[in-house]
Amino acid sequence: MIALKGIKKSYGTTQVLRGIDATIAAGDFVSIVGPSGAGKSTLLHLIAGLDAATEGTIHFAGQAIQDLDKAALNQMRNEQIGLVFQFHNLLPELTALENVLLPRWIGKKMDEVSEKDALEKLAFLGIADRAHHLPNELSGGEQQRVAIARALINNPSILLADEPTGNLDSANANAVHDLLVRLNEEFGQTVVVVTHNDQLAALGKKQWVMTDGLLKA
């Protein structure tokens, strides 16, 4: 599904990634661990097409993402990649349901079944009863579940999560862990997660350890 070859990334004179070669297959659950500053989040952002590598190639489903123009890259990201971050970035003026539907609106993919799809995602995540609440009416764990539902609304090929439990208490973090495992095991969702959480890292079928811009799979 994803092949990284010779990936290097520098910001000015600072080299963050020093040559990454790795593959992610459909159905994988990959956890990326390592100390702060090792390049974990940078690598995830490159896979998502949020930033460009200084050297090397990234192929997504056989397509070289570095060769895509901005419109094609945005379309790929909206339709095939689900993104979850430590901070949910929900729009405060929209309800949970409306936040989940955002990728459909942005991609001009709204149709008669979109709301049903969104409600099904919220139900899977255990918060269908919160669909019409604003973000400030939800707990931190509920907000993160809405963010996960939003990432899943277009049925992406891969879910990329950057410290998805970093801002949650242990109970809510464990709930998110369980949801990610269910997505992977029951639905075959490909998951790649950057984490400092040992429990979440241990769930990965593959564990990548990053140190000083290098990866040990």
Where are these regions (language model features)?
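Conserved switch/coupling elements of ABC/ABC-like ATPase nucleotide-binding domains
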Residues: D212-A217
